[in-house]
Structure formats: C-alpha cells, structure tokens
C-alpha cells in the first residue's frame, strides 16, 4: 500500500497546455476594505464558481521522514465533482491513474496490471494517495481556492497586522473543528489555510504562492500542503495550466484492464 500511496501522491497532473480562460470579471469589491465577512465570502464564492474545469501538468514533490519523491503529474478536474490524477514516468507514461467522483474512487496501475476501487471517502483517497482528504478539499488545494462554507454566519473576519491581508476564522461545527484562512487584501487571493480538528490540533496547512493571471483569473503556480500530524508534505509546481476549456466525460470513466489483479490493502 505504501508504495502505491507514495506513487500516487506525486501524481496530480494530466496533459494541460497553454493557459487560456474566458476573461474573469474582477469583482467590484476587489481593492475595497471589508469590515464584515459576508461580502468577502461572497467574492470568494464567486471566484470559486468561476473555475469550472482545469487541465494541467505539474511537478509533485512528496516529503516524508523516510524519503523525498519527485515526479511529473497530470491533473484534470471538474470543480467539486470529479478529479483525475496521473503519475507519469520519466518517459511520460502513466504509472498510476486515480479517478475520483462524488461517490466512487478507482486506482489503476497500467504497467503492473493492478487496480483498486471503492466508495468515495477521505479514507479511500488517503489509502491511495497518502493524503486522507475528501474530494472537495483536494479540488480546493489544486485550485488555490477556499472550500465551500456550509454556514457563512459561522465566519469571523479580522485584519492582519500591517493591513495587507484579511484573516477568516471559520467554525465548522463541534465535531469538525475550525479553519483559518488568510486572504490578500490587494487581489483577494487565498494565500494560506490552516485546519484544526475538534481537539484543536493542526491537521492541515495549505500555502498558495507564485500567483499569475490566466485570462485575468489569479492562479497559484505553487501550492504547498503539510499534514503535521503525519510528518508529510507535498509541493505542487505547475508547469502549464488550462482553465475552463472543457474536459471529456471519458476521462472520468477509468476502465479496469482485462485480467488486472485487485490490490488487497489492509
């Protein structure tokens, strides 16, 4: 299991070229001062909704106490609904393919003739990738956005020292913990997020960096993810990105090769 997990964690990228997206209408509130969370959350939701599909190629570097692993990956996603990740060999061949949808996940190793599939859950994604995160969180990480917030009334807004950023304190319920997000005041991009579990432990750090506009849409070309309780971190360096160019349904219909052996993980 560990070898498959490490191989797929470095996997998040599928054939993307260029970087074209229909012009993004800059919200009228960008550049203005927010004193309450509601209007800022509305802008972030608008931006998240503006990103429908992504295709990209990226370099993934996974760091664990035992070793560092680096490989190119391909990413294809439909925001909030489906994700396809391919780990690529030095020759560009996919050595592992993950397809995750709202209710199902499948992992195929084309070269070794092995596969695994099952119901969608954060545990299932963790089994394959080593990152026990749900589909919504994975998409938010890969796009540098703030995941949807169920109840905006549970958000508090503070101003960072120096006045260059906002801090959003998001309560996610007594059993779910909370989240703190830092949003740049200049362009309202999500620069970092920290998740805490119900006991107050930091369980996820996300940092977005190297923002560049794609058709007017501010996109982070470097993302760093850390799971401190697992001593595991992942850096994603995008090489090229295409936004809102559409993706084929067939990319999310991963077939099991004839004669493939099912992976039995404990």
Range-by-range predicted roles:
Residues 35-41, 53, 109-179, 254-258:
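Flexible, processing/modification-adjacent segments and terminal tails
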Residues 59-65, 90-93, 107, 213, ...:
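Hydrophobic lipid-interacting interfaces of membrane-associated proteins
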Residues 1-16:
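Sec-dependent bacterial lipoprotein signal peptides
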Residues 46-54, 66-69, 76-81, 186, ...:
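Edge/loop elements at the starts and ends of beta-strands within beta-rich repeat scaffolds
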Residues 18-20, 81-137:
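An acidic-aromatic
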Residues 15-70, 264-266:
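N-terminal leader/targeting segments and the immediate start of mature chains
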Residues 151-265:
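Gly/Pro-enriched, hydrophobic low-complexity segments
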